[in-house]
A protein has these predicted regions:
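Conserved ATP-binding subdomain of kinase catalytic cores across diverse folds
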Residues: 30-141, 168, 172-173, 276
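Juxta-kinase regulatory segment immediately upstream of eukaryotic protein kinase catalytic domains
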Residues: 1-43
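Hydrophobic residue at the +6 position relative to the catalytic HRD Asp in the kinase catalytic loop
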Residues: 180-190
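C-lobe/activation-segment region of protein kinase-like
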Residues: 194-272
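Short, glycine/acidic-enriched loop or turn micro-motifs at the edges of active sites
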Residues: 136, 182, 204
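Catalytic-loop of the protein kinase fold
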Residues: 172-182
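AlphaC helix of the protein kinase catalytic domain
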Residues: 140-150
Length: 276
């Protein structure tokens, strides 16, 4: 998408969380076009369909770091998925904005949304962006890679139980999270085995889901992302036993079989195995 060919939208086309509009206007970010063409900051990830960058702006409280996800070539299947979920055209950025607010309303931590905007044509998304505040914490996989070998057995157990109970709380809120990979989970400051946890990368999240099969598919994604160099069978049993609910009426063997089956599907689909 060549954003230079589009007329600038009015500032009202962008939805801001309270208190942020003037901060971004001062930095020259006032329209959808401004955000989509912004070249400041540091890119931290991209593929054919989206880009992620981080940048710092001056605010009344001092410099603040933000993250922006830009959906530059929205995938048709994702546009159709949001249409089914919301029963109206909805950009990928608005979808993630709404899901972040839903999680926070349920008491489940995630990045705090700042603003979003989109360019729609005939009900189809041409591109969109979503800006969040920086999460004060550390990605779970980074924490594991740096500290796992030095954690005591009790601290490891504490972290595993916390993780299992966190995922159970997400599911008990009726939320399905297909991308429940360890790298989409954060430990909040002060970082440690008992830290509160948070989710990121929300655009495939779904609400109002209670089906056991879908919850087990989520857990299969988590299983896939747990590297054997850190998580042996005993560690995984601690985690998943902390998650399990008596009302699901599944034996441990049936539960593990279904989770592992989904993890195997993901391994076959991925070109590269996870590493951290």
């Amino acid at each position: 998408m060549d954003w230079s060919t589009h007329e600038k939208d009015s500032m009202d086309a962008i939805e801001f969380a309270s208190g942020w509009r003037a901060v971004f206007a001062e930095a020259g970010l006032a329209t959808v076009d401004d955000f989509m063409r912004y070249e400041g900051g540091t890119p931290i990830g991209h593929n054919r369909h989206r880009q992620v960058l981080t940048f710092v702006l001056d605010t009344p409280g001092g410099p603040r770091r933000f993250y922006m996800k830009r959906f530059i070539r929205p995938h048709l299947k994702d546009m159709l998925a949001t249409l089914r979920r919301f029963r109206r055209p909805c950009s990928q950025a608005e979808c993630e904005w709404r899901y972040a607010r839903t999680l926070l309303a349920q008491g489940i931590e995630t990045y705090h949304p700042v603003c979003h905007g989109s360019l729609m044509r005939y009900g189809f998304e041409q591109g969109s962006f979503f800006v969040t505040e920086e999460i004060q914490g550390q990605c779970l996989t980074d924490y594991i890679a740096e500290t796992w070998k030095n954690l005591s057995a009790e601290d490891r157990r504490m972290l595993l139980v916390s993780l299992g109970r966190f995922v159970r709380r997400v599911h008990e809120a009726g939320i399905s999270f297909p991308d429940l990979y360890a790298w989409h989970i954060y430990l909040l400051d002060p970082v440690g085995p008992s830290s509160p946890l948070a989710l990121i990368d929300l655009h495939r999240m779904r609400c109002g889901v209670k089906r056991l099969g879908e919850r087990l598919r989520n857990l299969g994604a988590l299983e896939y992302s747990l590297l054997e160099r850190y998580f042996d069978d005993d560690a995984k049993r601690i985690l998943f036993e902390a998650y399990r609910r008596p009302e699901d009426r599944l034996s441990w063997e049936d539960f593990r079989s279904r989770v592992l089956r989904r993890a195997d599907v993901l391994r076959q689909r991925r070109r590269h195995a996870p590493d951290y």
